[in-house]
């Protein structure tokens, strides 16, 4: 059957209601077992901040400019720490076993496949540092930029759909 990996997936949607967290074990092929799910709802304040910054972006160039702003940097940190809190809540569901990989989606601010551009807010490097204090997460690899990598490989930025 091969090595069994433990993975933690973090996912948000366009509704901006919150983040879903799931822990699975898999060998990447025929074996899959769900260990736990959790959901952390955005506060109205955080939801409004996300909607506010998204409303300022109507083009790829505007997105490229806004991600240089202090408003963006502050919101990115807040979103990253929100994810960290959700991770803190769910790590117990994994039975205390080490998490091999964390799939960090972030929140899509702008998505324009025809421009070969997409941008998700959230900082994987900061997330990695913030979870290092948890024994079963300190060696976890964080993967991110799913949409960007899909677009760069001729996809539409939806790597989980055919």
Annotate each PLM feature.
Residues 1-162:
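Short acidic/glycine-rich loops and adjacent helix/strand connectors
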């Amino acid at each position: 059957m091969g090595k069994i990996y433990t993975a933690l997936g973090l996912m948000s949607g366009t509704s901006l209601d919150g983040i879903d967290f799931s822990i699975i074990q898999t060998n990447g092929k025929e074996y899959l077992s769900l260990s736990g799910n959790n959901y952390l709802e955005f506060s109205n304040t955080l939801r409004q901040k996300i909607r506010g910054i998204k409303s300022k972006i109507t083009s790829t160039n505007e997105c490229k400019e806004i991600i240089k702003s202090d408003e963006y940097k502050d919101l990115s940190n807040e979103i990253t720490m929100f994810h960290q809190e959700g991770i803190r809540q769910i790590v117990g569901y994994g039975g205390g076993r080490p998490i091999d990989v964390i799939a960090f989606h972030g929140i899509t601010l702008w998505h324009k496949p025809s421009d070969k551009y997409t941008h998700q807010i959230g900082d994987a490097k900061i997330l990695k540092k913030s979870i290092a204090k948890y024994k079963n997460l300190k060696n976890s690899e964080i993967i991110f930029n799913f949409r960007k990598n899909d677009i760069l490989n001729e996809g539409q930025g939806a790597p989980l759909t055919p």
